[in-house]
Amino acid sequence: MLDLTYEAPKPKVIAGAKHDWELVIGMEIHAQVSSNAKLFSGASTTFGAEPNSNVSFVDCAMPGMLPVINEFCVAQAVRTGLGLKAQINLVSAFDRKNYFYPDLPQGYQISQLYHPIVGEGEVLVELAPGIARLVRIERIHLEQDAGKSIHDMDPNLSFVDFNRTGVALMEIVSRPDIRGPEEAAAYVAKLRQILRYLGTCDGNMQNGNLRADVNVSVCRPGQYEKYQETQDFSHLGTRCEIKNMNSMRFIQQAIDYEARRQIAILEDGGKVVQETRLYDPDKGETRSMRSKEEAHDYRYFPDPDLLPLEIEQGWVDEIAASMPELPDAKKARFMADYGVTDYDANVLTAELDAAAYFEEVARGRDGKQAANWVINELFGRLNKQGLTIADPPVKAGQLGGVLDLIASGEISGKMAKDLFEILWTEGGDPAEVAAARGMKQVTDTGAIETAVDEIIAANPAQVEKAKANPKLAGWFVGQVIKATGGKANPAAVNQIVAQKLGL
C-alpha cells in the first residue's frame, strides 16, 4: 500500500471582519448505479432516450404494480461498500420517503433510512505527495432517482420526463471531516475514481450520474476539536445544504461563497437558518431553495411492498473475490514495479484506461521511459486535440514498438518523436514505418569514424579549443549528427569523437 503520512485535518481559515472562522463540510454523493435496468423494474436506464420511452408500469406507479428488487443493483452497492472498506449489512430494509412533486409519480421515494445496505467506511484523499486525509463514510444506501421536470420548453407549461424515475442511486454520506473547498473537490474526484475502477458508477457529472449535496457550516477555531471530543454537532454551527452540484469547480465556488455568507450573518449578530440552497454559477452565489427538512418531515415508514433485504456472507465473499485492483494499490504497484515517481503514478492511475495503456507499454520495458512517453507525448497530444485515452490514435502496442526501436539503438529520441507523429496521423507498424522512411540510425562505426575524421580535419582551430576545454567536444558531435542527416547514433558519435580528440 501507499506510504502515506497522516496529519490532522487542516481547516480552511477564513478571516472575517471581526474573527477568524473555520469551515466544516459533509457531503452526500448521489451516484447512479451502472446497471442496464432500474432498481425495481426492468425498464432501460439508457441516457438520452426519447422522453418517457424508458418507463415501465412500476416506474409510473400504475395501480397494482409491485416493485421487484434488481439483484445486480444490490451487488453493485455491495461492491462499492467493499471498495470503500465499509461494513456490509447482511440485513437491510427499504422505507418510503413521502413527499409530493410532479416528477415523483408514486408520491414517495423508496429509500433506506433506518437500515442501509452499507455501514461505515472510509475514503483516503491524497492532498499532496505523501500526505492524505481520511474522510469517514457514515453509510451508503440504495434509493430511487426521481424524474426530470422541464420548464423551458413552453412559457406556460411544464413537462415531466419519467425516464430517470426509478433508476438506482447509491447515496454515499460522509462525516463532517472535510475542512476546505479544495478538499471537497479532491474527495469527490477520489470517490469518482474509485467508483469508476469498481465499475459501479460511470461518474459522468455532465449527465447527472454523479451529483453532490454539500453541507456547509462555519465555526470558531477550537470548536471542531470540541465536536471531536463530544460528538456534539452544535459545536460545528448551523449547516446549510447546497443541492445537486455537478462540477468540481462549482463545488469549490459554492462552498467559498456560502461560508462567507454565513460569516457575514454571524458577525452582524444574526443567526444562520438551516435550509437547502442552490448555487447559481452565473452569479457566483447561493440562493435559498426551501427550509431544510428533517427526517420526520418526510414521514418515513417501512415499505410494505418490499420484504427486508437479506444477503448471505458467502455471496458477499464472492463479490469480494472478484474485486479489481483499486487506485491506491495500483499506484503503489506502479511505483514499486516500474520505478515511476509519485506524481507520474498519480497521473497514470487517474483513469483505468490510462493505467491499462501504460502497463501494456511498460511491461518488459523501462518503466520510467514508458511513463515519460505516455504522459508527455501521448497525454499531451490527446489533451491538445480534445481526445480521450479510450480510443487513442497510437495504440499501446505501437508506442511499445517505438520504445523497442529506441532501446535497440535503431532510432534516436528525435527520430522516435518524428515516428510517433507519423503513427498518430497515418498509423502502421513502427518498425516498418521507420524502415520505409529511412529513419534508422547509423550505427556502423566505420561510417561514423569517416564523418568524424572529415569534421576534425576541416576544423583544426576547433580541435585545439576542444582539447583545452573538453566540454567543447559537443560541437563535433553536433556537426557529425548534422552531416549524417541526424541518423548517427549519438552515443557512438560521442565515444568516437572523444577517442579521436584524445579526451
From Swiss-Prot:
It is an enzyme of class 6 (ligase). It comes from the Bacteria. SUPFAM superfamilies: GatB/YqeY motif, Glutamine synthetase/guanido kinase. It holds the Pfam family GatB_Yqey. InterPro entries: Asn/Gln-tRNA_amidoTrfase_suB/E (IPR017959), Asn/Gln-tRNA_Trfase_suB/E_cat (IPR006075), Asn/Gln_amidotransferase (IPR018027), Asn/Gln_tRNA_amidoTrase-B-like (IPR003789), GatB (IPR004413), GatB_C_1 (IPR042114), GatB_Yqey_C_2 (IPR023168), Gln-tRNA_amidoTrfase_suB_CS (IPR017958). Keywords: ATP-binding, Ligase, Nucleotide-binding, Protein biosynthesis. It catalyses: L-glutamyl-tRNA(Gln) + L-glutamine + ATP + H2O = L-glutaminyl-tRNA(Gln) + L-glutamate + ADP + phosphate + H(+); L-aspartyl-tRNA(Asn) + L-glutamine + ATP + H2O = L-asparaginyl-tRNA(Asn) + L-glutamate + ADP + phosphate + 2 H(+). GO terms for molecular function: asparaginyl-tRNA synthase (glutamine-hydrolyzing) activity; ATP binding; glutaminyl-tRNA synthase (glutamine-hydrolyzing) activity. Signal peptide: none annotated. GO terms for biological process: glutaminyl-tRNAGln biosynthesis via transamidation; translation. Its EC number is 6.3.5.-. The keyword Nucleotide-binding applies. Belongs to the GatB/GatE family. GatB subfamily. Heterotrimer of A, B and C subunits. Allows the formation of correctly charged Asn-tRNA(Asn) or Gln-tRNA(Gln) through the transamidation of misacylated Asp-tRNA(Asn) or Glu-tRNA(Gln) in organisms which lack either or both of asparaginyl-tRNA or glutaminyl-tRNA synthetases. The reaction takes place in the presence of glutamine and ATP through an activated phospho-Asp-tRNA(Asn) or phospho-Glu-tRNA(Gln). This is Aspartyl/glutamyl-tRNA(Asn/Gln) amidotransferase subunit B. It comes from Cereibacter sphaeroides (strain ATCC 17029 / ATH 2.4.9) (Rhodobacter sphaeroides). The lineage of its organism: Bacteria, Pseudomonadati, Pseudomonadota, Alphaproteobacteria, Rhodobacterales. The gene is gatB.
